[in-house]
Amino acid sequence: MLRSELRDMVVAMVLWGILLPFCLSQTTSPSQDGKIKFRLAGYPRKHNEGRIEVFYNREWGTICDDDFTLANAHVLCRQLGFVEALSWSHSAKYGPGSGKIWLDNVICGGSENSIEKCVSRGWGNSDCTHQEDAGVICKDERLPGFAESNIIEMQVDEKRMEKIRLRPLKGAHAGRLPVTEGVVEVKFKEGWGHICNTGWTIKNSRVVCGMMGFPSQRSVGKKPNSLKSAYRIHSVTCSGNEAHLSACTMEFSRANSSAPCPGGGAAVVSCVPGLQFTQGRVRKAKLNPVPQMRLKGGARAGEGRVEVLKGSEWGTVCDDHWNLQSASVVCRELGFGTAKEALTGARMGQGMGPIYMNEVQCGGDEKSLWDCPHQSITAEDCKHTEDASVICNIPYMGFEKLMRLTGGRTRLEGRVELLLPAGGGVRDWGLICGDGWTSREAMVVCRQLGLGHASSGLRETWYWDSSNVTEMVMSGVKCKGDEMTLTDCQHHSVVSCKRAGAQFSAGVICSDMASDLVLNAPLVEQTVYIEDRPLHLLYCAAEENCLAKSAAQASWPYGHRRLLRFSSEIHNIGKADFRPRLGRHSWVWHECHRHYHSMDIFTYYDLLSLNGTKVADGHKASFCLEDTECHEGVSKRYECANFGEQGITVGCWDLYRHDIDCQWIDITDVSPGNYILQVIINPNFEVAESDFTNNAMRCNCKYDGHRVWLHKCHLGDSFSEEAEKEFEHYPGQLNNKIS
């Protein structure tokens, strides 16, 4: 009897477990009138992104972000007429909507042709608020045959400001960039208009200057002449903390009409540029005080993952409640304007190390992000997949007009040509010598042209269409990688190029995404040990130059070499896979170890004295770049077995165990003492990355002749500059940069 009751209870529980999801989730039923429309809303945003709004049963509403995924975004973007989704946003990133929340707990596979085919709680069944409205970011590429009017019913408001600009005042500096002072002009559907300055305040100017890329404003010294203008906007009132003028209160005239501006004229602002956008900007940037904030992983100036300095170590910020006000505080602190976008979900790549801040809620007038209310982090609060990022407004400098790419197959690639003075006030185009050209120089070119990250830096461009430009005008270019223009980099004062001819001029290939490799520093510290390895086991290692030079004079096969061994775990935390520069047809077969080398040098291992002298070294040719393990939800793509493709997928890592050949430094000739262990990934910048400053790792090393200890292992850019100098006690290579 008891067994029968137990069986019935189990059956009931199983049925309840099966039926419950069907009670809560159902395929979204069609609209009663069959007319479902979609649009993107919110502000500020681009035309291919925004809060997703659905027109159902004659009423516009939103979609809740509960259970929202990229698969949902793919379906919605296709219904909006775009080919696919790039990302999605939660927590009303584009502002809260109004009216109904039509859909909640939507779960799509990604291949559905309509959101109606996805599972959800049903139309109008939601427990969300508009603070949970979902948004999408679609790839800016239209589906063939999709008429714009069919899929996006844009709610174009007469009052919407499409663009804002400063028209320079007449005077000595009218043609100088950036434009820091001028008449505020606003673009509407029907053209440009002015703002009546009656009641205009310095707080209003602060908002406009922020949009123009300037951190602060000043009083206007000169008033413009009387303008016969269309004053579409009147009575503007800002608090000064808005990220966009559209967030201020104001009065509008009707379209195609204007109202007079009694006793006033056009609004004029005067802005103060950040140090990096002033005359002599390179020299002044070097004199800047030690920063407490930085941006990492971005392709362009003024964008990147937000990192803050606490004590002597850099850490990231969690994206909970991250918004434009908080992002604008970061941007102004760094000498930019207000934030154009406050990005969540590690859109600029994941950081490493500590996460210092969570639930940051700035008012907008704080001098530093540390001044804003925020929560400390516990282990359960955040992961680096939630690192906050920003895209700041920066002043227009016209840098892209001084450079162009020619001969390439797309606008993202080509031979680099510079516009430089040619004498007599004439400017002419010229080429750059390809000698010594690397992906770091390509990074600067792609940044200057606004084309994203560098994919490749090319020393020969003979395979691209030739142009009538043949003269070399720059050579010996050596960049750190973070410069805004190529002329900011070191270069020869007099052109000197070993290989003449346009076919040996520098070229680049740019890309929206880039990889970013970092070493797991704690693992190096945990796995280090010393091995006395017999010479008869080291023939292959000797063939591949993995031993010190003194090994050539050893009594082979007798004796041994003393090896400092450790594991290297190399993570790709960027936004694109790390691939060898050369295709598999160019890989070199090494018979002794029975494997292919896809890169000549992938990693340097160095043991340095405290004065910076190299006392022992090693290297690791990338005989097998593959995905050893990946984070949850990420699939392996690269495997070396059977001459497979080599690389490291985003979110995966390649592990070189301590017990494999050449995973060591030969310290047979090293005396006991204190040293620095240094590991540098991708040391020759052979493959482009979004950030080279985190490619170096250092540890304090103590060797007593029998045992070895490592401590304070850290990435080269994880400490403040002062702490790093104290650590190394010597000048030289810092953060894998030239110093």
Swiss-Prot record:
GO terms for cellular component: collagen-containing extracellular matrix; cytoplasm; extracellular space; membrane; nucleus. GO terms for molecular function: copper ion binding; fibronectin binding; protein-lysine 6-oxidase activity. Disulfide bonds join C64-C128, C77-C138, C108-C118, C196-C261, C209-C271, C238-C248, C318-C382, C331-C392, C362-C372, C433-C497, C446-C510, C479-C489. Its EC number is 1.4.3.-, 1.4.3.13. It catalyses: L-lysyl-[protein] + O2 + H2O = (S)-2-amino-6-oxohexanoyl-[protein] + H2O2 + NH4(+); N(6)-acetyl-L-lysyl-[protein] + O2 + H2O = acetamide + (S)-2-amino-6-oxohexanoyl-[protein] + H2O2. Protein-lysine 6-oxidase that mediates the oxidation of peptidyl lysine residues to allysine in target proteins. Catalyzes the post-translational oxidative deamination of peptidyl lysine residues in precursors of elastin and different types of collagens, a prerequisite in the formation of cross-links between collagens and elastin. Can mediate oxidation of lysine residues that are acetylated. Also able to catalyze deacetylation of lysine residues. This is Lysyl oxidase homolog 3A. The gene is loxl3a. PANTHER family: LYSYL OXIDASE HOMOLOG 3, LYSYL OXIDASE-LIKE-RELATED. It is found in: Secreted, Extracellular space; Cytoplasm; Nucleus. Gene3D superfamilies: SRCR-like domain. Its cofactor is Cu cation; lysine tyrosylquinone residue. SUPFAM superfamilies: SRCR-like (SSF56487). The lysine tyrosylquinone cross-link (LTQ) is generated by condensation of the epsilon-amino group of a lysine with a topaquinone produced by oxidation of tyrosine. Disruption phenotype: No visible phenotype. Contains 1 lysine tyrosylquinone. Residues 1-25 form the signal peptide. It comes from Danio rerio. There is a cross-link at K620-Y656 (Lysine tyrosylquinone (Lys-Tyr)). Keywords: Copper, Cytoplasm, Disulfide bond, Glycoprotein, LTQ, Metal-binding, Nucleus, Oxidoreductase, Repeat, Secreted, Signal, TPQ. One of its GO terms (biological process) is inflammatory response.
